[in-house]
Amino acid sequence: MSKLQNITLSAVTIILAACSETVITPPEAPALDINFEKFTLENGLDVIFHVDRSDPVVAIDIAAHVGSGREVTGRTGFAHLFEHLLFLDSENLGYGGLDEMNTRIGGEGTNGFTTNDMTQYFQAVPKDGLEKIIWAEADKLGWFINTVSQDVVDNEKQVVKNEKRQRVDNQPYGHNLYIVSKALYPEGHPYNWQVIGSLADLDAAGLQDVKDFYAKWYVPNNVTVTISGDFDTAQAKSMVEKYFGEIPRGDDIPPYEAQPARLTESLNLYHEDNFATVPQLSLTWPAVEQYHPDAYALDILISYLTEGKTAPLNEVMIDEDKVTSGVSGFNYTKEIAGELYLFVSPNEGQDIDGLMPSLNKAFERFEENGISQDDLDRIKAGIEVDFYGDVQSALGKAIQLGEYNVFTGDPGFYKKDIANIQAVSTDDVMRVYNEYIKDKPSIAVSFMPKGQRELALDGADKAKVVEEVVVAGEGAAPDFNPAARVLSTTTPSKFDRSIEPEFGATYELPVSDVWRDTLANGIEVYGIQSNETPLINFSLRIDAGRELGSVQKPAIAAMTADLLEKGTAQKTTAELENAIKSLGSSISISNGDTGTFISGTTLKRNFGQTIDLVKEMLNEPRWDAEEFSLLKSKILQDITQSEGNPNAISARENAKLNYPENHIFHYTRYGPKDKLETVTLEDLKKFHSLYYRAQNAKFRIVGDFTKNNVISAMKDMFPEKTHPIKEKAKLPAAKEITTSKIYFYDVPEAKQSVLRIERPSLTSTDPDFPLAEAINFPLGGIYTSKLNSTLRVEKGYTYGIRSGFNGDIDRGTFNVRSSVRTNVTKESIELIRDIVGNYGPDFTQEELDIMKGALLKGQALKNETLSDKLRMLGEISAYNYPADYRAQNAKAIEAMTLQDFKSLAEKYLRPNAMNYLVVGDAASQMDGLKSLGFGDPVLLNGAE
């Protein structure tokens, strides 16, 4: 994608015509106000400051102009491996010190990512931690390399390989981008390989590779530091100069020149996928690099072709020809080249060849009709409104300003970016279609289930994919003890860097003023006013969750919500979509366990018109039989597709283990296919009539609104209904777990085992719930948790592991979840059991004090964005919490004693009374689990 889709703005002026006419006046040039100051240190380090005093938060972003494209053949994946290493250690922070410090001072964790062209590292903390994070990030950049040993490199290789297994090797269609990059770019081209690299190349990486990469690329003159938030610029400049200024400049790095891909003929490839249950076709065309003049028109082109009811590909392939249930695509722009992608899967029982006549028909229709000015302006308006989401946090601004500086040398390049998107014309869209897609060579890749080669596109050649074979004993963690490391060499400094800076000045934690009211029609309204941007976020919660559905037809509640998006009595689906988008608004309807949620985002001036559309959707559904049929077909296709996804399998089987067959939650959202087939349109109408009413509704709103406007808009949200409200039936109890049992779902040749360890636990309204969440924080709630520190950092078994309490009004669970390397399945479960079991007894007063400090200081980051505020209102309204519930919870946590902690852990953490669910390769792993002491594992799909 062009960077336009990711930039951040403080203000965008969009002038739209009235909703009823659904005609859009082209947006005027945006009025932007992202204040920033840029300066460069003598060593070449670019520094950007952005001051935002709306919240007591500061964020820092370190952007290095190096990604996988700077790697050499035989060392693919190295830039990403280096990203992992840089987080681990530095001379003055110590091993794991960066994450430990972030947690201790109230941050929400450090993070980063690597692309083909850059690597970014970032964190946000309360404002009094500014000097601490500047000190820490400088220590990473300048005082890192002496801490790296071959043991450190070898251990982190295992983590990265687990990430590859989780994201690529153990997922349906996971190898698609690998196949395309190998086919599209010649050997030696920087984009011939994926960012994650190959397992063989990762294995080959050594300590000298780390040193060479660091010396060449991680130098001040190739790095941008961006600081955003509530801080004093003069003080911050002094800090940056002190901590970063003495890092030596590196060699000059020449700029990258564009190297676009060239295809002289189309390529047709296939891959039999171990995890695919339905075929998929991807089509890829060579395109252009980021900021190329044509990149903006290509963004709009792919959006118009694939998004929405009137999109030409959807209109023909889904609605008319019914050969697929979904089409997607994106324009992937990178620094020196780009690709245009299209993805489509045939409906069940069809092959990929059957897609092509319909696809060609859709393209021909587009060639005939083109794109209208209204459609063009509507897409532009939607892109612009999306920008606001990125400016609500200090961290989002830091990341984007740094990224612009890396690639253009100008943090303010967003002005040019916006101007470029505004300049795209309908002729431009047609021109880039003709130049890059029509009759142009492409790469077709067919994926199909193993053993079903006949489903591929006719004439396809087998793609070369290197599949990992996980062998028992291979990939074992080295004898690794990071605490024992001794530095033989240190990097000199003009001052003692081992002393962590003190906290800055104290600050007042802002408290949101929560407005609440009950309207005459019974709707409860909750609001928080915020005028940082001219945006409003809202959510209407209706007590119409899937708990009210039928065991015989579990999908009724979810399908009702889905179908309400498919038109109204006055508007077809296409007309409704156009009416919403013409306002620059978004409206979505989703269904959860206990409620249905109508969520939206709108510009302040269009709030009334947007709410009018919400009313129309809720009160005057179209109940279109054709749309119902299409919806059911899509859900059936999605269920089939999920049957090969290990994570989806885990969720489905876990529901069965937790609840009896006569409980609605025994099933996932739509239930099994045979039950879905029986759902009728009349079922949805009846559910809507029974439960969609004012007495069941709570409205939450945050942003730049007035109370009078909200009250006026909501007064006739629901029509009067004469029949009484149907009482919620009492659901059966969840299955009781008194002893642990292991359940295994076999996915032959799985590269990882998906673990889900769970038991029933607290409801969200239980007085102990916030305290239980607190005690889980050091166990599995953060990167530095005991579970993650052991299984990922120390052992290299997983890319990540989390634990947590999840609750609603009537039920709750405690679970531990992870994906681990196949050949350490037993060892991972053993560690989890022991860590959870010993957690309470071994917990110390020092650890308790750190936990309290982290949770209490972290409150500063909990109320920064509109989404944060809306989430808080959601909890207040759903669970009848007091407006100051967070402050009350903080007091309870502060008062917790060590004995309180241990008692809570003993009561709620019970590793010997949990279901242990494993989704993985039974042939190699199941027998080994017998020695864990939980009896013989139960094979869940043994008859299949």
Predicted regions and their residues:
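Proteolytic maturation boundary segments
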Residues: 19-47, 232-273, 280, 314-315, ...
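Short, conserved secondary-structure transition motifs
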Residues: 160-167, 259-272, 379-391, 602-603, ...
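A common structural junction motif
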Residues: 138-148, 243-251, 360-371, 617-623, ...
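Gram-negative bacterial Sec-dependent N-terminal signal peptides
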Residues: 1-20
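M16 family metallopeptidases and their MPP-like homologs
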Residues: 50, 55-71, 77-81, 96-143, ...
